[in-house]
A protein has these predicted regions:
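Membrane-embedded alpha-helical bundles of multi-pass transporters/translocases
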Residues: 2-510, 514-525
Length: 528
C-alpha cells in the first residue's frame, strides 16, 4: 500500500518537529524574557524577604495580626484567581493573550509595593496600621494575580520542548542575579544609620522598595513590547464552545496537576523558615549583615548547578531529578538542626544560643555558611524542575482534553499555592508570637537585639526544621507524578501531530478566505 503524499509530508513535519532543532526565540526576545525575570525576581525576593520583618518591626503590627491578614488575603486571592484564570484564558488581543497583563497591572502592584514599606505619620493607632497593612497586601497580590500571567509565556513563546527546557534553565540561572540587590539590603540597614543619623533603618527599606518597583516595572514594560506568543491556541469561538463548568471539570480531573500541586503545597512550607531569616540573623547572630555575608557564599554553587540541571533532567527525567533534590535538601536541613547553629566554643546551656561573638565567632560563621550552602544546593534544581513539570501539566491537559486552558489550570494550581500561602503566612506570624518575641526599639527607631535563649532557640528551630519537612514531603509526593518516561514521549509525539494539523487547517482556512474575498464570494461556514 502506497502512503498518501499528504500523510508522508505530515510524517516528515512531525519527525522534524520531534528533533526539536528549529530555533523560534529571537535574541531580542531572550533578552526581554531574562530582563523581565530579573526584575520580577528582584521585587519578589525583596517583598518576600523583608515584608514581614518591616511590618512587625517598624509599622508596629503584631505577629498574630500579620499572620491573620496574610491568611485571609490568601483565601481571597484563591477566589480571585478563579476569575483571573478564566479571563486570561479567554483573552484574545492583537498583542496576544498574556502580554497585555504585563503592562496594565504595573500601577497596581507598583503603588502597593511602596505602601508595604512605608509608615506614614498619620498612622497613629493600631487599627489604622492594620487597615494600611490590609490595603497594601491585598492590592499587591491583586495586581500580581494578573501580572503573573507573563510566566505562562514560558510555555507559549516557543513550541519546541527542548528550547523551552533550555529557556527554563537559562531563566532560573538569570534569577540568581535577581537576588543580589535584595541581598545587600541588610548591609545598608546595618550601616547607613551609623553613617548618617538622619537615615533610619526603615528609610533604607523604603528606598529599596522604590528601586525594586522601578526595576520590575521597567523590565515588564520592555518585555511587553519585545516578546511574542507562538503556541497555536484555540480560537475565541472554540473556547466559547467549552463551558466554564467543563473547563473546571477538565482542570480538576488533571491527575498530574494535583500531584504537582500537593508537592508544591508542602514545599511552600519552606517559606515559614525563610520568613524568620531576618530575625535569625539579627537576634541569633547579632547582625543583619551576617546574612548578607553568608549569602555571598551560599549562592555560588547555584551558578554551577543551574546550567547542568537540563543535563540532569535529560538523563534522569524532571520528576526523578526533583525527587532526588527534595530528599537531599531534607537530609541537609535536618543535619544542620541536629548540629545546631553555634557548635563551637566553650559555652553550654543558655549561653549556647547567645551570639557569634568571641573567639568562636568566626568558626561558627564559617560552619553555618557551609551548612546553608549544602542545604541550598537543590534550590535551583527544584525551581527548574517545578517549571518543567508545570509545562508537562499544561501539555497533559492539551493532550487529554484538546485545549491547553493554561490560565485555568494555573488558577486551580494556585488554589493550593494560595492555601499554602495562607497556612504559611499564618504560621509565619504566629511562630513569632509563639516563641515569645516582642519588638523593642531605641530612641532612633532602630530594632534592638533580643538575647532570650527561648526566643533564639525558637527562631533557629523554625529556620531549620520547616525547610527540612518541606523538602522531604516535596520529594516523596512527586513519586506519584506519572507524566514521565515513555508515557511522556508518546504523549508529546501525539501532541506534535495535532499541533501541525491545527496549523495546517488554519492555513488552509486563511487561504480559502483570501481566495473567496478575491473572487467576490461570500465564505460559507463548512459546519453549516
Amino acid at each position: 500500500t502506497v502512503a498518501d503524499p499528504s500523510e508522508q509530508e505530515l510524517e516528515k513535519e512531525v519527525k522534524k518537529a520531534s528533533e526539536q532543532n528549529r530555533r523560534y526565540i529571537r535574541p531580542s526576545e531572550l533578552v526581554a524574557f531574562l530582563l523581565t525575570t530579573f526584575g520580577q525576581k528582584n521585587l519578589d525576593q525583596f517583598v518576600n524577604a523583608y515584608r514581614q520583618f518591616f511590618m512587625i518591626s517598624f509599622l508596629g503590627i503584631s505577629g498574630r495580626a500579620y499572620g491573620l491578614i496574610v491568611f485571609i488575603e490568601s483565601i481571597y486571592d484563591a477566589v480571585d484567581d478563579s476569575l483571573s484564570g478564566l479571563i486570561i484564558d479567554r483573552t484574545r488581543t492583537r498583542w496576544g493573550r498574556l502580554r497585555p497583563y504585563m503592562i496594565i497591572t504595573v500601577p497596581i502592584w507598583g503603588l502597593a509595593t511602596l505602601m508595604l514599606f512605608t509608615t506614614p505619620q498619620f498612622l497613629s493607632g493600631n487599627t489604622s496600621k492594620i487597615v494600611w497593612a490590609v490595603i497594601a497586601i491585598f492590592a499587591y497580590n491583586l495586581g500580581m494575580s494578573y501580572f503573573n500571567a507573563w510566566q505562562i509565556l514560558l510555555y507559549n513563546i516557543t513550541p519546541s520542548l527542548r528550547e523551552r527546557d533550555n529557556l527554563i534553565a537559562t531563566s532560573k540561572f538569570f534569577e540568581l542575579f535577581g537576588t543580589w540587590i535584595p541581598a545587600f539590603v541588610p548591609i545598608f540597614v546595618s550601616f547607613m544609620p551609623k553613617i548618617s543619623k538622619s537615615i533610619g533603618m526603615q528609610d533604607v527599606y523604603s528606598g529599596f522598595a522604590v528601586a525594586m518597583m522601578v526595576i520590575a516595572g521597567g523590565t515588564a514594560i520592555y518585555g511587553f513590547f519585545a516578546m511574542r506568543e507562538r503556541v497555536p491556541l484555540a480560537s475565541r469561538e472554540q473556547m466559547q464552545e467549552i463551558s466554564v463548568l467543563d473547563s473546571f471539570k477538565n482542570a480538576v480531573k488533571n491527575k498530574p496537576m494535583f500531584i504537582l500541586m500537593l508537592a508544591n503545597f508542602f514545599n511552600g512550607f519552606k517559606s515559614v523558615g525563610a520568613s524568620t531569616e531576618s530575625f535569625f540573623w539579627l537576634h541569633n547572630t547579632g547582625s543583619l549583615a551576617n546574612g548578607t555575608i553568608a549569602g555571598l557564599f551560599t549562592g555560588i554553587p547555584n551558578f554551577i548547578i543551574t546550567p547542568i540541571t537540563p543535563k540532569l533532567i535529560h538523563k534522569f527525567g524532571a520528576r526523578n531529578t526533583a525527587i532526588g533534590a527534595g530528599i537531599f535538601g531534607g537530609i541537609a536541613y535536618t543535619l544542620m538542626f541536629i548540629i545546631g547553629y553555634a557548635p563551637f566554643g566553650s559555652y553550654s546551656g543558655a549561653e549556647r544560643y547567645k551570639n557569634f561573638s568571641g573567639g568562636s565567632g568566626v568558626a561558627n560563621m564559617v560552619y553555618i555558611t557551609i551548612m546553608l550552602t549544602i542545604c541550598g544546593l537543590p534550590n535551583c534544581i527544584i525551581r527548574v524542575c517545578q517549571a518543567v513539570l508545570q509545562g508537562d501539566v499544561y501539555d497533559y491537559s492539551e493532550w487529554k482534553y484538546g485545549v491547553r486552558n493554561e490560565g485555568l489550570v494555573a488558577t486551580v494550581s494556585n488554589y493550593f499555592t494560595k492555601l499554602a500561602n495562607a497556612v504559611t503566612g499564618l504560621l509565619s506570624g504566629l511562630v513569632i508570637t509563639f516563641v515569645g518575641y516582642t519588638s523593642h526599639k531605641d530612641a532612633l527607631g532602630n530594632v534592638l537585639r533580643d538575647t532570650s535563649p527561648k526566643v533564639l532557640m525558637g527562631f533557629f528551630a523554625v529556620f531549620a526544621l520547616m525547610p527540612a519537612i518541606a523538602r522531604f514531603l516535596f520529594g516523596i509526593i512527586l513519586i506519584f507524578f506519572n507524566v514521565h518516561g515513555k508515557f511522556k514521549e508518546d504523549m508529546m509525539k501525539e501532541l506534535e501531530e495535532r499541533r501541525l494539523e491545527r496549523v495546517r487547517k488554519m492555513t488552509e482556512e486563511e487561504k480559502a478566505l483570501e481566495s473567496s474575498e478575491t473572487n467576490g464570494e461570500i465564505p460559507i461556514n463548512a459546519d453549516n
